[in-house]
């Protein structure tokens, strides 16, 4: 995970290139349009949008929705933080988000299997 807001562009590009040269993929985490542009300039193949503002720790899924159109479909687009319900995932799917990173909802869950099934939309009757 490479955080675009922390790394300068040259360092970010070197890290992305090193990962690719080693046969690995790197998620470049962003939170703003400027950071998404930086990630695209350095050739990121996976771009994550952190919905949590690390300055005040507020969470807004609209961060992902606002930035989605900046990234072509050939780049994997990941929404990170603040995803708690199946409805959140359905909203993100509707906007062609390729993957989600779920941490807090799973960590707070007492029944992780059930929580994962609910998030995936698996009916208990199936």
Feature locations, PLM:
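Glycine- and Gly-Pro-enriched alpha-helical subdomains that act as flexible
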Residues: 2-4, 15-18
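Glycine-enriched alpha-helix->loop->beta-strand junction motifs that scaffold or abut catalytic
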Residues: 20-24, 41-48, 72-74, 93-100
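Catalytic cores of alpha/beta
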Residues: 32-42, 79, 83-102, 114
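Glycine-rich phosphate-binding active-site loops on the catalytic face of alpha/beta enzymes
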Residues: 1-7, 48-57, 97-115
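Short, hinge-like loop/turn segments at secondary-structure boundaries
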Residues: 17-20, 44-47, 65-66, 118-120
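Active-site mouth loops of central-metabolism enzymes
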Residues: 4, 25-29, 78-83
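Short loop-to-alpha-helix "cap/lid" segments that border enzyme active sites
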Residues: 7-15, 31-33, 37-42, 54-74, ...
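C-terminal helical cap(s) of enzyme catalytic domains, especially alpha/beta-barrels
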Residues: 66-70, 93, 108-126
């Amino acid at each position: 995970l490479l955080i675009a807001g922390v790394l300068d562009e040259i360092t970010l590009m070197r890290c992305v290139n090193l990962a690719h040269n080693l046969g690995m993929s790197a998620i470049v985490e962003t939170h703003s349009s400027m950071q998404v542009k930086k990630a695209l300039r350095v050739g990121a193949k996976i771009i994550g949008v952190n919905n949590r503002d690390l300055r005040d720790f507020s969470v807004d899924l609209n961060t992902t929705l606002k930035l989605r159109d900046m990234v072509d479909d050939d780049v994997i687009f990941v929404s990170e933080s603040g995803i708690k319900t199946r409805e959140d995932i359905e909203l993100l799917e509707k906007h062609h988000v390729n993957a989600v990173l779920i941490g807090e909802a799973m960590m707070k869950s007492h029944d992780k299997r059930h929580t994962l099934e609910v998030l995936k939309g698996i009916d208990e009757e199936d």
